[in-house]
């Protein structure tokens, strides 16, 4: 660390500690005691300098900060069920929706403080950080869903359906799409959701039955409000419902049958692309398996899909054109050589080969990339460069977002936030960070250019496309057709 940044951090932490004690005099002695502990002062300095959001949580809710320290939570790797268990404990005795929303937001602030503390101090790697944010989102959805289901069932009865001759209670399932489905949420992600339920029917146990679709629509609205709405206590996660069938004009909730019919009859290639990461984040295991099994044939096809190849080529062109049109050079996600291009490379192979190569039916980008090397879909050196770039870019994204809890992937332009970002990522100055960033983005751009090559860009690719068309039209002799299929990973 350079002398300039060291002095900046030292000056900042002295001022921040004084401000904390002034605003929270009842915690002043406690903080002084903690500062005597090994590593605490250094970790506090890194956290408060690297994340003004984390510092504000400590200022405004010192009881949450103290509880984490007393529990030694900053030193602990949480088990998968820890987030749900901690939140469930905090919701005990709550029977009012307003109190639920306050508790959800309080829990979010506390858990994000822990996650950012561990991230900036490199007590957690990228996989743990994204997993923890995703599990926090899952727990919030599950607990809010269960609360509102109980509340609405008390008013309108329990939704049921006739299944194998038996009236059976029905539940609403929540599909987590995108990064939530893949346990890859960043520090300030929105969450893409789709709601569905197994069978049509109506409620029972109330004076006037209600159609299941209406019941679950009301439930969905309550859930979104509890998670998404900005209040005096903040929000939990921004909710995006645009990936559902028919988009913003579609029903908020669909039955399994209606979902299956939509994707079979009207599902588009970009929806296949989106469905790769889909995962049930709330709902019973039995119904979760059922809906995923219904959607799998739409996502992964066991034959060569020529239209998908062309759609992916168009998508690739759109990605590059959008980056140029919007001037996204400083965007580590959407700009050239950014996170989206790495995700596109992985998902291209999944859509084209995933139906035949089960190892590619994986939600997490890093696992897909490793599978591509193992299956000789990409050279090992290319995969290694992409993996290194992915970790670097995602860590950069987190450093940007942790600063003020803002959903941004744009590199800062001013000196102070630049010095904070470089410090968060362990660089002595912005210049060293920028050089490393350029190296990774250059590597990603090079590999992105080689995927689904435009015919005009490569005579070899043009020749291969011509051979595929001849195969499609039945113009190749059987031995030649067989060799073409085998050479390109198809039996």
What residues fall within each predicted segment?
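A nucleotide- and high-energy phosphate-metabolite-utilizing enzyme signature
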Residues: 1-491
